[in-house]
Amino acid sequence: MAAECGSGNCDAWAARDPSGILSPYKFNRRAVQSDDVSLRITHCGVCYADVAWTRNILNNSMYPLVPGHEIAGVVTEVGADVKSFKVGDHVGVGTYVNSCRDCENCNSSLENYCSQHVFTFNGVDTDGTVTKGGYSTHIVVHERYCFKIPDGYPLEKAAPLLCAGITVYSPMMRHNMNQPGKSLGVIGLGGLGHMAVKFGKAFGLKVTVISTSESKRKEAIDLLGADNFVVSSDENQMETLKSSLNFIIDTASGDHPFDPYLTLLKVGGVMALLSFPSEIKVHPANLNLGGRSLSGSVTGGTKDIQEMINFCAANKIYPDIEMIKIDYINEALQRLVDRDVRFRFVIDIENSFK
Protein backbone atom coordinates (compact mmCIF):
# COMPACT_ATOMS: atom_id res chain seq x y z
CA MET A 1 0.00 0.00 0.00
CA ALA A 2 1.49 3.33 -1.03
CA ALA A 3 2.05 5.98 1.62
CA GLU A 4 -0.10 9.08 1.40
CA CYS A 5 2.86 11.36 0.72
CA GLY A 6 4.94 8.63 -0.92
CA SER A 7 7.93 10.10 -2.72
CA GLY A 8 5.99 13.21 -3.56
CA ASN A 9 5.34 16.33 -1.56
CA CYS A 10 4.64 16.15 2.16
CA ASP A 11 2.62 19.04 3.60
CA ALA A 12 4.04 20.67 6.70
CA TRP A 13 4.56 23.91 8.58
CA ALA A 14 8.11 25.20 8.93
CA ALA A 15 10.10 28.06 10.41
CA ARG A 16 12.34 29.82 7.91
CA ASP A 17 14.44 31.98 10.24
CA PRO A 18 15.08 32.72 13.94
CA SER A 19 11.84 34.66 14.25
CA GLY A 20 10.38 31.20 14.76
CA ILE A 21 7.27 32.05 12.79
CA LEU A 22 5.91 28.95 11.09
CA SER A 23 4.03 28.84 7.79
CA PRO A 24 2.98 26.21 5.23
CA TYR A 25 5.80 24.28 3.58
CA LYS A 26 6.18 21.28 1.27
CA PHE A 27 9.07 18.82 1.12
CA ASN A 28 9.88 15.27 0.09
CA ARG A 29 10.04 12.40 2.55
CA ARG A 30 12.43 9.58 1.68
CA ALA A 31 11.14 6.43 0.02
CA VAL A 32 10.37 3.50 2.30
CA GLN A 33 13.38 1.19 2.70
CA SER A 34 13.29 -2.49 3.66
CA ASP A 35 13.33 -1.82 7.42
CA ASP A 36 11.24 1.36 7.41
CA VAL A 37 7.74 2.15 8.57
CA SER A 38 5.74 4.92 6.94
CA LEU A 39 2.94 6.53 8.88
CA ARG A 40 0.22 9.06 8.32
CA ILE A 41 0.54 11.51 11.18
CA THR A 42 -2.73 12.17 12.97
CA HIS A 43 -1.46 14.15 15.97
CA CYS A 44 1.70 15.86 17.18
CA GLY A 45 2.39 17.24 20.64
CA VAL A 46 4.00 20.64 21.14
CA CYS A 47 7.17 20.65 23.23
CA TYR A 48 9.39 23.52 24.40
CA ALA A 49 12.08 22.03 22.15
CA ASP A 50 9.92 23.23 19.26
CA VAL A 51 10.32 26.79 20.56
CA ALA A 52 14.05 26.39 21.19
CA TRP A 53 14.90 25.22 17.69
CA THR A 54 12.43 27.25 15.64
CA ARG A 55 13.80 30.39 17.36
CA ASN A 56 17.45 29.24 17.18
CA ILE A 57 17.89 29.57 20.93
CA LEU A 58 20.65 26.93 20.82
CA ASN A 59 22.35 28.54 17.79
CA ASN A 60 22.26 25.36 15.72
CA SER A 61 18.94 25.54 13.86
CA MET A 62 18.89 24.50 10.21
CA TYR A 63 16.18 26.20 8.18
CA PRO A 64 13.64 25.56 6.86
CA LEU A 65 12.86 23.73 10.09
CA VAL A 66 9.85 21.47 10.61
CA PRO A 67 9.51 20.82 14.37
CA GLY A 68 7.61 18.17 16.30
CA HIS A 69 8.81 15.04 18.12
CA GLU A 70 5.66 13.82 19.87
CA ILE A 71 4.17 12.00 16.91
CA ALA A 72 1.19 9.65 16.73
CA GLY A 73 -0.37 8.17 13.64
CA VAL A 74 -1.35 5.17 11.54
CA VAL A 75 0.95 2.90 9.54
CA THR A 76 0.39 3.23 5.80
CA GLU A 77 3.31 1.19 4.46
CA VAL A 78 6.02 -1.14 5.78
CA GLY A 79 9.30 -2.25 4.27
CA ALA A 80 9.86 -5.82 3.10
CA ASP A 81 11.86 -6.80 6.18
CA VAL A 82 9.59 -5.23 8.79
CA LYS A 83 8.01 -7.84 11.07
CA SER A 84 6.76 -5.81 14.04
CA PHE A 85 4.26 -3.56 12.27
CA LYS A 86 1.55 -3.80 9.66
CA VAL A 87 -0.59 -1.36 7.73
CA GLY A 88 -3.29 0.08 9.97
CA ASP A 89 -1.33 -0.18 13.23
CA HIS A 90 -1.47 2.80 15.57
CA VAL A 91 2.09 3.93 16.28
CA GLY A 92 4.20 6.70 17.74
CA VAL A 93 7.56 8.30 17.04
CA GLY A 94 9.52 10.19 19.67
CA THR A 95 12.53 12.45 19.98
CA TYR A 96 15.01 10.49 17.85
CA VAL A 97 14.78 8.52 14.62
CA ASN A 98 18.18 6.89 14.35
CA SER A 99 21.28 5.78 16.26
CA CYS A 100 24.35 3.67 15.53
CA ARG A 101 22.61 0.46 16.74
CA ASP A 102 25.99 -1.03 17.65
CA CYS A 103 27.39 0.78 20.69
CA GLU A 104 27.07 -0.20 24.34
CA ASN A 105 24.16 2.19 24.82
CA CYS A 106 22.24 1.00 21.77
CA ASN A 107 22.81 -2.62 22.77
CA SER A 108 21.38 -1.80 26.20
CA SER A 109 18.24 -0.13 24.76
CA LEU A 110 19.62 3.27 25.76
CA GLU A 111 19.63 4.69 22.25
CA ASN A 112 18.85 8.14 23.65
CA TYR A 113 22.43 8.22 24.98
CA CYS A 114 24.06 7.00 21.76
CA SER A 115 26.64 9.56 20.61
CA GLN A 116 25.32 9.17 17.06
CA HIS A 117 21.60 9.35 17.77
CA VAL A 118 19.66 11.51 15.33
CA PHE A 119 16.98 13.92 16.49
CA THR A 120 13.55 13.62 14.88
CA PHE A 121 13.89 17.18 13.63
CA ASN A 122 16.87 19.48 13.09
CA GLY A 123 19.15 16.46 13.11
CA VAL A 124 21.47 15.17 10.39
CA ASP A 125 20.67 11.61 9.37
CA THR A 126 23.20 9.08 8.12
CA ASP A 127 22.47 10.02 4.50
CA GLY A 128 23.30 13.67 5.21
CA THR A 129 19.73 14.93 5.06
CA VAL A 130 18.30 17.20 7.73
CA THR A 131 15.45 15.54 9.60
CA LYS A 132 12.02 17.13 9.64
CA GLY A 133 9.49 16.48 12.37
CA GLY A 134 5.86 15.90 13.07
CA TYR A 135 4.29 19.20 12.08
CA SER A 136 3.65 17.36 8.84
CA THR A 137 1.30 14.86 7.28
CA HIS A 138 3.66 11.91 6.98
CA ILE A 139 6.95 10.47 8.26
CA VAL A 140 9.19 7.52 7.38
CA VAL A 141 11.33 5.95 10.13
CA HIS A 142 13.33 2.81 10.81
CA GLU A 143 11.10 0.35 12.66
CA ARG A 144 13.36 0.40 15.74
CA TYR A 145 12.26 3.97 16.49
CA CYS A 146 8.56 3.35 15.99
CA PHE A 147 6.32 2.25 18.87
CA LYS A 148 3.01 0.44 19.04
CA ILE A 149 0.09 2.31 20.56
CA PRO A 150 -2.50 -0.17 21.84
CA ASP A 151 -5.88 -0.12 20.14
CA GLY A 152 -8.31 1.96 22.13
CA TYR A 153 -5.70 4.39 23.47
CA PRO A 154 -6.56 7.78 21.91
CA LEU A 155 -3.89 8.91 19.48
CA GLU A 156 -4.23 12.53 20.58
CA LYS A 157 -3.42 11.46 24.14
CA ALA A 158 -0.60 9.17 23.02
CA ALA A 159 1.36 11.91 21.27
CA PRO A 160 2.66 13.69 24.42
CA LEU A 161 3.82 10.37 25.85
CA LEU A 162 6.60 10.27 23.24
CA CYS A 163 8.50 13.11 24.93
CA ALA A 164 6.79 14.48 28.04
CA GLY A 165 5.76 11.02 29.21
CA ILE A 166 9.00 9.16 28.63
CA THR A 167 11.17 12.01 29.91
CA VAL A 168 9.52 11.53 33.29
CA TYR A 169 8.97 7.76 33.23
CA SER A 170 12.55 6.79 32.36
CA PRO A 171 14.30 8.33 35.41
CA MET A 172 11.47 7.23 37.67
CA MET A 173 12.06 3.62 36.68
CA ARG A 174 15.85 3.93 36.73
CA HIS A 175 15.77 5.20 40.31
CA ASN A 176 13.05 2.80 41.50
CA MET A 177 10.49 5.52 42.04
CA ASN A 178 7.72 2.96 41.65
CA GLN A 179 7.65 1.72 45.25
CA PRO A 180 4.18 2.08 46.80
CA GLY A 181 4.15 4.10 49.99
CA LYS A 182 7.28 6.12 49.18
CA SER A 183 7.12 9.91 48.82
CA LEU A 184 7.71 11.94 45.65
CA GLY A 185 8.19 15.66 45.19
CA VAL A 186 7.44 17.15 41.77
CA ILE A 187 8.97 20.54 41.01
CA GLY A 188 7.01 22.37 38.32
CA LEU A 189 3.56 21.57 36.97
CA GLY A 190 3.77 21.85 33.21
CA GLY A 191 3.75 19.18 30.53
CA LEU A 192 6.38 17.05 32.27
CA GLY A 193 5.35 17.82 35.84
CA HIS A 194 1.74 16.83 35.39
CA MET A 195 2.87 13.48 33.95
CA ALA A 196 5.15 12.97 36.97
CA VAL A 197 2.14 13.42 39.23
CA LYS A 198 0.10 10.93 37.19
CA PHE A 199 2.88 8.32 37.21
CA GLY A 200 3.55 8.89 40.89
CA LYS A 201 -0.08 8.26 41.82
CA ALA A 202 -0.20 5.18 39.57
CA PHE A 203 2.89 3.83 41.36
CA GLY A 204 1.23 4.31 44.75
CA LEU A 205 3.47 7.18 45.87
CA LYS A 206 2.54 10.07 48.14
CA VAL A 207 2.96 13.02 45.78
CA THR A 208 3.79 16.59 46.74
CA VAL A 209 3.78 19.27 44.05
CA ILE A 210 6.26 22.10 44.61
CA SER A 211 5.56 25.24 42.60
CA THR A 212 6.43 28.92 42.54
CA SER A 213 2.76 29.74 42.01
CA GLU A 214 -0.07 29.35 44.52
CA SER A 215 -2.44 29.39 41.54
CA LYS A 216 -1.34 25.82 40.70
CA ARG A 217 -2.68 24.39 43.97
CA LYS A 218 -6.18 23.60 42.72
CA GLU A 219 -4.86 21.96 39.55
CA ALA A 220 -2.36 19.89 41.49
CA ILE A 221 -4.74 18.56 44.13
CA ASP A 222 -8.23 18.68 42.63
CA LEU A 223 -7.42 17.93 38.99
CA LEU A 224 -4.35 15.70 39.20
CA GLY A 225 -4.85 14.14 42.62
CA ALA A 226 -1.62 15.22 44.30
CA ASP A 227 -1.57 14.62 48.06
CA ASN A 228 0.13 17.87 48.99
CA PHE A 229 1.09 21.24 47.52
CA VAL A 230 3.85 23.60 48.60
CA VAL A 231 4.83 27.05 47.36
CA SER A 232 8.61 27.05 47.06
CA SER A 233 8.99 30.69 48.13
CA ASP A 234 7.15 30.06 51.42
CA GLU A 235 9.87 29.21 53.93
CA ASN A 236 7.43 27.80 56.47
CA GLN A 237 5.87 25.43 53.94
CA MET A 238 9.29 24.30 52.73
CA GLU A 239 10.46 23.78 56.31
CA THR A 240 7.63 21.31 56.94
CA LEU A 241 8.90 19.20 54.02
CA LYS A 242 12.53 18.93 55.12
CA SER A 243 13.94 15.38 55.07
CA SER A 244 10.53 13.96 54.12
CA LEU A 245 10.83 12.94 50.46
CA ASN A 246 12.34 9.79 49.01
CA PHE A 247 12.44 11.18 45.49
CA ILE A 248 12.20 14.47 43.62
CA ILE A 249 11.50 14.97 39.93
CA ASP A 250 12.68 18.45 38.89
CA THR A 251 10.92 19.66 35.74
CA ALA A 252 11.28 23.40 36.39
CA SER A 253 12.47 25.33 33.36
CA GLY A 254 15.03 28.09 33.69
CA ASP A 255 17.55 28.76 36.42
CA HIS A 256 16.60 27.95 39.99
CA PRO A 257 18.37 27.05 43.26
CA PHE A 258 18.98 23.41 44.11
CA ASP A 259 19.97 23.40 47.77
CA PRO A 260 16.48 24.23 49.10
CA TYR A 261 15.12 21.18 47.27
CA LEU A 262 17.92 18.80 48.16
CA THR A 263 17.26 19.41 51.86
CA LEU A 264 13.75 18.04 51.34
CA LEU A 265 15.16 14.57 50.61
CA LYS A 266 15.50 11.84 53.18
CA VAL A 267 18.82 10.08 53.70
CA GLY A 268 19.65 8.30 50.45
CA GLY A 269 17.07 10.29 48.50
CA VAL A 270 17.38 10.97 44.78
CA MET A 271 16.60 14.15 42.85
CA ALA A 272 16.32 13.73 39.07
CA LEU A 273 16.94 16.83 36.96
CA LEU A 274 15.03 16.86 33.67
CA SER A 275 15.55 20.47 32.61
CA PHE A 276 18.56 22.44 31.36
CA PRO A 277 19.44 25.34 33.66
CA SER A 278 22.49 27.37 32.68
CA GLU A 279 24.38 26.12 35.74
CA ILE A 280 24.01 23.95 38.83
CA LYS A 281 25.27 25.16 42.19
CA VAL A 282 25.03 22.75 45.11
CA HIS A 283 26.54 22.86 48.58
CA PRO A 284 28.36 19.53 48.97
CA ALA A 285 26.98 19.08 52.49
CA ASN A 286 23.45 18.80 51.11
CA LEU A 287 24.57 15.75 49.15
CA ASN A 288 27.27 14.17 51.29
CA LEU A 289 25.77 14.46 54.76
CA GLY A 290 22.52 12.86 53.68
CA GLY A 291 23.87 10.38 51.17
CA ARG A 292 21.69 12.13 48.61
CA SER A 293 22.07 12.04 44.84
CA LEU A 294 21.42 14.54 42.05
CA SER A 295 20.96 12.76 38.73
CA GLY A 296 20.38 13.94 35.16
CA SER A 297 18.18 12.36 32.53
CA VAL A 298 16.97 12.95 28.98
CA THR A 299 14.04 11.16 27.29
CA GLY A 300 14.36 7.37 27.27
CA GLY A 301 15.46 4.30 25.33
CA THR A 302 13.29 2.24 23.02
CA LYS A 303 12.55 -0.46 25.59
CA ASP A 304 11.40 2.10 28.16
CA ILE A 305 9.27 3.96 25.62
CA GLN A 306 7.25 0.90 24.65
CA GLU A 307 6.96 -0.16 28.29
CA MET A 308 5.73 3.31 29.24
CA ILE A 309 3.10 3.38 26.49
CA ASN A 310 1.83 -0.04 27.55
CA PHE A 311 1.78 1.05 31.21
CA CYS A 312 -0.29 4.12 30.36
CA ALA A 313 -2.75 2.06 28.36
CA ALA A 314 -3.08 -0.60 31.07
CA ASN A 315 -3.56 1.96 33.84
CA LYS A 316 -5.65 4.47 31.88
CA ILE A 317 -3.11 7.26 32.29
CA TYR A 318 -3.82 10.09 29.87
CA PRO A 319 -2.03 13.43 29.46
CA ASP A 320 -4.24 16.50 29.86
CA ILE A 321 -4.19 18.27 26.52
CA GLU A 322 -5.51 21.24 24.58
CA MET A 323 -6.14 20.30 20.96
CA ILE A 324 -5.35 22.87 18.27
CA LYS A 325 -5.20 23.10 14.50
CA ILE A 326 -1.86 23.74 12.79
CA ASP A 327 -2.84 27.28 11.80
CA TYR A 328 -2.89 28.20 15.51
CA ILE A 329 0.66 26.97 16.10
CA ASN A 330 2.37 30.37 16.29
CA GLU A 331 -0.04 31.51 19.00
CA ALA A 332 0.36 28.18 20.78
CA LEU A 333 4.15 28.41 20.83
CA GLN A 334 3.97 31.88 22.36
CA ARG A 335 1.45 30.65 24.92
CA LEU A 336 3.87 27.84 25.75
CA VAL A 337 6.60 30.42 26.37
CA ASP A 338 4.14 32.35 28.56
CA ARG A 339 3.27 29.13 30.45
CA ASP A 340 -0.34 29.45 29.37
CA VAL A 341 -1.29 25.85 28.64
CA ARG A 342 -2.84 23.05 30.68
CA PHE A 343 -0.84 20.93 30.18
CA ARG A 344 0.18 20.05 26.62
CA PHE A 345 -0.84 21.39 23.22
CA VAL A 346 -1.53 18.69 20.65
CA ILE A 347 -1.91 19.52 16.97
CA ASP A 348 -4.81 17.82 15.19
CA ILE A 349 -2.73 17.08 12.11
CA GLU A 350 -5.25 14.90 10.29
CA ASN A 351 -7.85 17.68 10.29
CA SER A 352 -5.41 20.53 9.66
CA PHE A 353 -4.31 19.71 6.13
CA LYS A 354 -7.62 18.96 4.46
UniProtKB/Swiss-Prot annotation:
Listed cofactors: Zn(2+)
Catalyzed reaction equations: (E)-cinnamyl alcohol + NADP(+) = (E)-cinnamaldehyde + NADPH + H(+); (E)-coniferol + NADP(+) = (E)-coniferaldehyde + NADPH + H(+); (E)-sinapyl alcohol + NADP(+) = (E)-sinapaldehyde + NADPH + H(+); (E)-4-coumaroyl alcohol + NADP(+) = (E)-4-coumaraldehyde + NADPH + H(+)
Gene Ontology biological process terms, A to Z: lignin biosynthetic process
Highest taxon of the lineage: Eukaryota
GO molecular function: cinnamyl-alcohol dehydrogenase activity; coniferyl-alcohol dehydrogenase activity; oxidoreductase activity, acting on the CH-OH group of donors, NAD or NADP as acceptor; zinc ion binding
InterPro entries: ADH-like_C, ADH-like_N, ADH_Zn_CS, CAD-like, GroES-like_sf, NAD(P)-bd_dom_sf, PKS_ER
Residues engaged in binding NADP(+): 167, 188-193, 211-216, 251, 297-299
Pathway assigned in UniProt: Aromatic compound metabolism; phenylpropanoid biosynthesis
Keywords of the record: Lignin biosynthesis, Metal-binding, NADP, Oxidoreductase, Zinc
SUPFAM superfamilies linked: GroES-like (SSF50129), NAD(P)-binding Rossmann-fold domains (SSF51735)
Annotated positions binding Zn(2+) 1: C47, H69, E70, C163
Cofactor note: Binds 2 Zn(2+) ions per subunit.
Binding site for Zn(2+) 2: C100, C103, C106, C114
EC number: 1.1.1.195
UniProt similarity note: Belongs to the zinc-containing alcohol dehydrogenase family.
Binding partners and assembly: Homodimer.
Function: Involved in lignin biosynthesis. Catalyzes the final step specific for the production of lignin monomers. Catalyzes the NADPH-dependent reduction of coniferaldehyde, 5-hydroxyconiferaldehyde, sinapaldehyde, 4-coumaraldehyde and caffeyl aldehyde to their respective alcohols.
Name of the molecule in the record: Probable cinnamyl alcohol dehydrogenase 1
Annotated source species: Oryza sativa subsp. japonica (Rice)
Gene giving rise to this polypeptide: CAD1
